[in-house]
Amino acid sequence: MSESYNHIFVSLRPMTAEMYHAYYKEYQNDPDLYIDKSKYTPFVYSPEWVNNYIQRQISRNRKCFAIMLRDEMAGEIIIKNIVPGKSAALGICMKNAHYKDRGIGTQAERLAINYVFNELDIPLLYADSILTNTRSQHVLEKVGFRLLREEGDFKYYSIERSP
């Protein structure tokens, strides 16, 4: 799965254990995304943490993809809560600030939506965003998600496949 727009070439590749370790060695969590800033602590790479994370993804029957900017891993997209033929949910995380505000996440979300609708044959996709993540909310709305509701610290979205 790939897409090129404004000379930015983005593709999605299934995540491998090696890719996860490479990703998290360079990962930086964003303090601006914490509602309670006192709970923020910088991410510190740990091989054990990454191995446990991989096992959680496998045990939850998720489809995990690396967001590739040419040959660089820019982030991760996860298709989760999969109910075959009915619905799934989308999650996205960029590796660090270098990959934000460049259209990479937008292209990756478009590719993921296409994959869910056409490859998995799932007609309904959900996503959510914490209230403070206005960047994510903008991208979700830009690619066609519609706001369902605001509840607690989150906004909930959905997009349906066209008939």
Can you annotate each of these PLM segments?
Residues M1-A22, E26-L33, C64-P163:
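Acyl-donor (CoA/ACP) binding surface of acyl/acetyltransferases
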Residues Q55-N61:
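Short loop/turn motifs at secondary-structure junctions and domain boundaries
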Residues N52-Q55, I78:
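Short secondary-structure capping micro-motifs at structural edges
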Residues D32-Y53:
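Conserved GNAT-fold acetyl-CoA-binding loop/helix
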Residues P31, T41-P42, I58, L148:
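Residue-level detector of secondary-structure transition/capping positions
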